[in-house]
UniProtKB/Swiss-Prot annotation:
It comes from Thermoplasma acidophilum (strain ATCC 25905 / DSM 1728 / JCM 9062 / NBRC 15155 / AMRC-C165). This is Large ribosomal subunit protein uL15. Residues 1-13 have a biased composition (Basic residues). One of its GO terms (cellular component) is cytosolic large ribosomal subunit. GO terms for molecular function: rRNA binding; structural constituent of ribosome. One of its GO terms (biological process) is translation.
């Protein structure tokens, strides 16, 4: 009975080298060996960030403004009141948008409630619309 070629080559090292044909084939190194050489194409295709990221990293904290329109304040007025961001002091209505998490008041839409609005920044359009109905804007304790 003659052994087949594969069986003959399994133990020796002439036909396929020492370890080839024993189950794992010819690996070309284990793990990440050869990523910069013979496994380069695999790395570029399946692991493009293998040697590190690309581009620049921003190391400063970016401050993102959270804006709100006058029309949105009008629309959300009841929910702001329910959540405690609208209060009444000395007969004057105060809307604290800074405490509600907003940084800038934009002038799109209409606001009809005469009140004092507390916010850090406001556009000229928002200020003119509010002053037309007799409202004020306060930022850092000073009126705008």
């Amino acid at each position: 009975m003659v052994r087949e070629r594969t069986k003959k080559l399994r133990g020796g090292h002439y036909g396929r080298g020492f370890k080839a044909g024993r189950g794992k084939g010819k690996k070309g190194g284990s793990g990440n060996a050869g990523m910069g050489k013979h496994k380069w194409i695999w790395m570029v295709k399946y692991d493009p960030l293998h040697f590190g990221g690309k581009g620049f990293t921003s190391h400063h904290i970016s401050q993102v403004e959270v804006p709100i329109n006058l029309g949105d304040v009008e629309y959300m007025y009841e929910s702001l009141k329910r959540d405690g961001f609208v209060r009444e002091e000395n007969g004057e209505i105060i809307v604290d948008l800074r405490a509600a998490g907003y940084d800038k008041l934009l002038g799109n839409g209409n606001f009809t409630v005469k009140s004092t609005i507390i916010i850090d920044k406001a556009t000229e359009k928002a200020i003119s619309k509010l002053s037309a109905i007799g409202s004020k804007i306060e930022n850092d304790g000073s009126s705008a």
